[in-house]
């Protein structure tokens, strides 16, 4: 009886929720008071041509820091589940010529593309999260081609820690000038210029390096766990 009543209760509650929402919210007339203010003032106030960057780092930068904390917690939990990285299996053969040559060719390209996406995040769509994923891919591909050559987890941890410290320090510096935490400092500059938007490019660089180091370490740990598992 309870098994049958559960889906019915869920469906009834969901239908009631939809009814309340449709009855209270006017259809076709969304309330965008905050959005209009951001669209009208972000470019002149923050100096970022990419309005999304203004929202992510300036208007709700504390949420972005929370997202970084969630990513750190997820990577830490995954690392604990996988266990301490053991010694890489030296007997495991490297990939074929095409895989090795492709990884060697793509590594510098991915580094350049990743840094470009990060450093231009305040000008064009992209930013630290997207560029960080590209940077992580650049360091994971060589591991897939040559399993015996694994980047140092200690070096990745240092980069991750320093990037996080720079993000928090940049945000805390605003407190010294009697501003809110993570308020953009420095001059907004000329809209559309590479050196503009105050400290937002610094924050995005910290985000990109932190995301790249965390994701690269996690994916490389996955490859190590697969190599250590019995065949």
Would you name each region that the model predicts?
Residues 70-79, 136-139, 143, 203-218:
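Hydrophobic cores of alpha-helical transmembrane segments in multi-pass inner/ER membrane proteins
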Residues 75-101, 225-231:
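Cytoplasmic juxtamembrane regions at transmembrane-helix boundaries
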Residues 118-127:
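Membrane-interface helix caps and helix-loop-helix hairpins in membrane proteins
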Residues 126-135:
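Structural signature of hydrophobic alpha-helical transmembrane segments
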Residues 156-186:
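A structural-propensity feature for long, helix-poor, extended segments
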């Amino acid at each position: 009886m309870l098994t049958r009543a559960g889906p019915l209760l869920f469906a009834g509650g969901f239908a009631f929720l939809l009814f309340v929402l449709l009855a209270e919210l006017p259809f076709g007339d969304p309330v965008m008071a905050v959005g209009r203010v951001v669209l009208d003032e972000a470019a002149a106030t923050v100096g970022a041509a990419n309005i999304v960057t203004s929202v992510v780092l300036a208007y709700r930068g504390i949420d972005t820091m929370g997202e970084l904390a969630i990513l750190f917690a997820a990577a830490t939990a995954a690392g604990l589940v996988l266990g301490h990285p053991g010694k890489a299996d030296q007997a495991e053969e490297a990939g074929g010529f095409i895989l090795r040559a492709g990884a060697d060719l793509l590594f510098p390209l991915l580094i350049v593309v990743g840094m470009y996406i990060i450093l231009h995040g305040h000008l064009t769509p992209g930013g630290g999260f997207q560029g960080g994923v590209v940077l992580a891919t650049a360091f994971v591909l060589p591991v897939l081609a040559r399993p015996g050559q694994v980047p140092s987890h200690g070096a990745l941890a240092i980069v991750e820690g320093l990037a996080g410290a720079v993000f928090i320090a940049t945000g805390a510096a605003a407190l010294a000038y009697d501003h809110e935490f993570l308020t953009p400092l420095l001059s907004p500059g000329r809209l559309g210029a590479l050196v503009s938007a105050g400290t937002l490019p610094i924050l995005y660089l910290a985000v990109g390096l932190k995301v790249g180091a965390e994701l690269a370490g996690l994916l490389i740990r996955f490859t190590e766990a697969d190599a250590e598992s019995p065949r």
